[in-house]
Amino acid sequence: YTDSEGNAKERAGHQVSVGYVAKQLKDAGIIKYKGLFQLYCSVSHAKTKIDPGTYELSTNYDYRALVKKMQVGSGAMVTTKVTIPEGYTMEQIFRKLEDENVCSYDDLMDAAANYSYNYSFLDQSMQGDAKRLEGFLFPDTYEFYQGMQASSAINKFLENFHNRITAEMLEKADERGMSMQEVVTVASMIEKEAANDDERAMIAAVIYTRIAAGMPLQIDSTIMYVLPEHKDVLTVEDTKIDSPYNTYQNTGLPPTPIANPGLASIKATLSPASTKALYYALD
């Protein structure tokens, strides 16, 4: 749209042609002649200079200024703050980012599965499976560019996770003989089960005790993770479903984290309560 001062918000899409950008600018009233803008872009090699995103532009800009403004860091890109709560699943996070016009859900899922992220905590054997990122999309408040590259949006979460994990945490994980994948898997179950911080360390202790005893964890939230629709309470039939995430039928940990835990759950995973209890009661 264009306001009374000739300013408009316009979106340059992901991997689109200069012709598409020219049409968007023309439709928004930013430029008068699509052909001239395309000619300028061709002569100045501007196609490689335009970054995808949503921009605040003015009818007062010439072609050179328009191209310069449609770049990351120009100050013209529209940003939005998004808060991700602890315990959100990857799918919930991606749906929220789509709702906030950051990236499309499909682009995010594709980037989650196929983009090469250089973090040692990710399971490289799961390349091609979006679930490899489950648990590592650290819940926090982020500022995103609207319409930014999906891989760049995801990298914000992963970099934040990387920065939150301290040397002390890594040392504790090593002492317990746990990979970061296992730590986050346990933390994700704690995140979904705990009603308050006081319960987290107890839940961690019970998980470890049951695993050591060869008992199924019987954690409802692992089954809820794979159900097609959300349920507040499982039925007996739900506990019989055929899934590696069914911790009523299988022993050990589920194959991946079931949510993205916060720091309190990760710390509880590494510092469980001193108890051999096999059960916990939730408030």
Map each language-model feature to its residues.
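Signal peptide-directed extracytoplasmic domains
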Residues: 1-164
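Bacterial extracytoplasmic/cell-wall-associated proteins, especially those involved in peptidoglycan
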Residues: 101-103, 117-283
